[in-house]
Amino acid sequence: MRAALFPGSFDPITWGHIDLVKRASLIFDKVIVLVANNSNKSYLLSDIERYELTFEVIMSLGWTKIFVDKYDGVILDYALKNNIGFIVRGVRAFHDFEFEFERYVVNNKLNSSIDTVFLPSSDKYLFVRSDLVKELIKNKNFNLSNFIPELVQKKLKSKFIDKLS
């Protein structure tokens, strides 16, 4: 079975993430969406909230080959422990590719048994990113249907509407 890992912070999960997961599931027998923590990032949602929201969204789509997990450690270690041979990374533009390629080189030097597959963003989601969603939320813009699913909008609105007033 060819399994792949699609790691990210998913703060919050966007239509762009969902599109990449769906496309990865066409290539691999199993895709694990891994909600990971990055100590260099500050998050809008807690790690539990990010995991639960990502899980709810993915499960609501009814995809049988896609699973959600969370991990607070080195992504390469998770892949090794779970016998996963591929890491899927989405790239929107050249600067994403440059960053992800550097990450691939480091991972390859640490363990060459795990390969990286780069998937370009679909045109429709080229400018969709979690940072943009967070910026819009902070500016009290909750009409985000082009960026995130309704389930995510409701969660963010209920969590932040009072804090931002």
Swiss-Prot record:
**Pathway, per record:** Cofactor biosynthesis; coenzyme A biosynthesis; CoA from (R)-pantothenate: step 4/5
Q: What is its EC number?
A: 2.7.7.3
Q: Which reaction does it catalyse?
A: (R)-4'-phosphopantetheine + ATP + H(+) = 3'-dephospho-CoA + diphosphate
Q: Name one GO biological process term.
A: coenzyme A biosynthetic process
What the entry lists under Gene3D superfamilies is as follows: HUPs
Q: Where does substrate bind?
A: 9, 41, 75, 89
Chain positions recorded as ATP binding sites: 9-10, 17, 90-92, 100, 125-131
- UniProt feature coiled coil, ranges: none
Q: Name one GO molecular function term.
A: ATP binding
* GO cellular component labels: cytoplasm
Pfam families in the record, alphabetically? CTP_transf_like
What SUPFAM superfamilies does this protein's entry cite? Answer: Nucleotidylyl transferase
User: What are the entry keywords?
Assistant: ATP-binding, Coenzyme A biosynthesis, Cytoplasm, Magnesium, Nucleotide-binding, Nucleotidyltransferase, Transferase
Q: Which domain of life is it from?
A: Bacteria
Q: Where is this site: Transition state stabilizer?
A: 17
| Alphabetized InterPro entries for the sequence | Cyt_trans-like, PPAT, Rossmann-like_a/b/a_fold
**Complex formation:** Homohexamer.
- State the similarity comment: Belongs to the bacterial CoaD family.
Described purpose of this protein according to its UniProt entry = Reversibly transfers an adenylyl group from ATP to 4'-phosphopantetheine, yielding dephospho-CoA (dPCoA) and pyrophosphate.
HAMAP family reported for this sequence: PPAT_bact (MF_00151)
Q: What is this protein called?
A: Phosphopantetheine adenylyltransferase
- Annotated organism of origin: Borrelia duttonii (strain Ly)
